[in-house]
Amino acid sequence: MAEHKPDIMYGTTIITVRKGGKVVIAGDGQVSFGQTIMKGNARKVRRLGKSGTVIAGFAGATADAFTLLERLETKLEQYPDQLMRACVELAKDWRTDRYLRRLEAMMLVADKKITLALTGLGDVLEPEDGIMAIGSGGNFALSAAWALVDMNLDAETIARKAMDIAAKICVYTNDHFTIETLDAELSSLEKAI
């Protein structure tokens, strides 16, 4: 288990669901500082790029996450319509740059083709089933989404219900959600069905 540093802002829940030709990223609005709620309506999910064709959500230290989002936007300008390449290049920088190496954040990013998680360890991970969650309530949201994915629900409904469950369990997650949706290609599992 990671060491809890009281001077760093922790906790949030971010989930992504790709289903039925849609991809959704949802996040809560709570910003915590140690054991204190500092803000309840933060916007941790946003559109990136000039055309808004990439959506991203972040968990971890807020200032660090904004730094990484800015860097990702720069990479997306260098590699337009190549989200995987932009994320891999960002991950390389994140691991090798002395300043970036200390940033404590994770991100979920998606475009119409792919969903990825980026970690401070330099990982760029793609979920095999189109669902992924990060943050202190991530495991609660992920479990809920997996339970709901086979039901006749769309991606946004699954994400919203999963976030509701995480908000009821995780003290670092509230029920003020920001949700962004894109039209998407079918996931590999959906194509196989």
From Swiss-Prot:
Compartments reported by the entry: Cytoplasm
UniProt KW Cytoplasm keyword: yes
Keyword Phosphoprotein: no
Main location: cytoplasm
Enzyme class: hydrolase
GO biological process, alphabetically ordered: proteolysis involved in protein catabolic process
Amino-acid positions noted as binding Na(+) in the UniProt annotation, renumbered to this chain: A167, C170, T173
Modes of activity regulation: Allosterically activated by HslU binding.
Subunit composition and interactions: A double ring-shaped homohexamer of HslV is capped on each side by a ring-shaped HslU homohexamer. The assembly of the HslU/HslV complex is dependent on binding of ATP.
Protein name per its UniProtKB record: ATP-dependent protease subunit HslV
Species annotation: Bartonella quintana (strain Toulouse) (Rochalimaea quintana)
Gene transcribed to yield this protein: hslV
